């Protein structure tokens, strides 16, 4: 426990909280060609590469991902949720924060049913998370 005199000489330092999705905390001014510190809940981007990745040790699968160049010129890796997708190179996508625990370096999710990304077909439950329309009947 510090004495009052020690605290007067050197006050307590507050912990620096680091963002879990840093690319969403950067804006871009295209007129001045300079980055700004405007944060946003989602960002638009263009898929530069679409592929599959294998997860970390105890799991085994082929997880779908896309490398996305955002509107603030930062390039990130984003996960494509759901079964099947229509994304290819140059597709315009919307990304949100949210990591995938068993894929190292994947800190973002692509929003299904927004921009060029189609919703998951024949989805009955949790439809809003996958951009699926309400089934007829």
Swiss-Prot record:
Gene3D superfamilies: Nucleic acid-binding proteins (2.40.50.140). The keyword RNA-binding applies. GO terms for cellular component: small ribosomal subunit. It comes from the Bacteria. InterPro entries: NA-bd_OB-fold (IPR012340), Ribosomal_uS12 (IPR006032), Ribosomal_uS12_bac (IPR005679). Keywords: Methylation, Ribonucleoprotein, Ribosomal protein, RNA-binding, rRNA-binding, tRNA-binding. The modification 3-methylthioaspartic acid is found at residue 102. One of its GO terms (molecular function) is tRNA binding. The keyword Ligase does not apply. Residues 33-57 are annotated as: Disordered. GO terms for biological process: translation. With S4 and S5 plays an important role in translational accuracy. Part of the 30S ribosomal subunit. Contacts proteins S8 and S17. May interact with IF1 in the 30S initiation complex. Belongs to the universal ribosomal protein uS12 family. HAMAP family: Ribosomal_uS12_B. This is Small ribosomal subunit protein uS12. It comes from Streptococcus thermophilus (strain ATCC BAA-250 / LMG 18311).
């Amino acid at each position: 426990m510090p004495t009052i005199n020690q605290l007067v000489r050197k006050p307590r330092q507050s912990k620096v909280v680091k963002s879990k999705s840093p690319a969403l905390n950067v804006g871009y001014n295209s007129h001045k060609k300079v980055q700004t510190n405007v944060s946003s809940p989602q960002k638009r981007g263009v898929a530069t590469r679409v592929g599959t990745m294998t997860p970390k040790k105890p799991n085994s699968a082929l997880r779908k991902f896309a490398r996305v160049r955002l509107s603030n010129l930062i390039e990130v890796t984003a996960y494509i949720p759901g079964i099947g997708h229509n994304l290819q190179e140059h597709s315009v996508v919307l990304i949100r924060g949210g990591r995938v625990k068993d894929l190292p370096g994947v800190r973002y999710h692509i929003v299904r049913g927004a921009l060029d990304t189609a919703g998951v077909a024949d989805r009955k439950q949790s439809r809003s998370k996958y951009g699926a329309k309400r089934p007829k009947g």
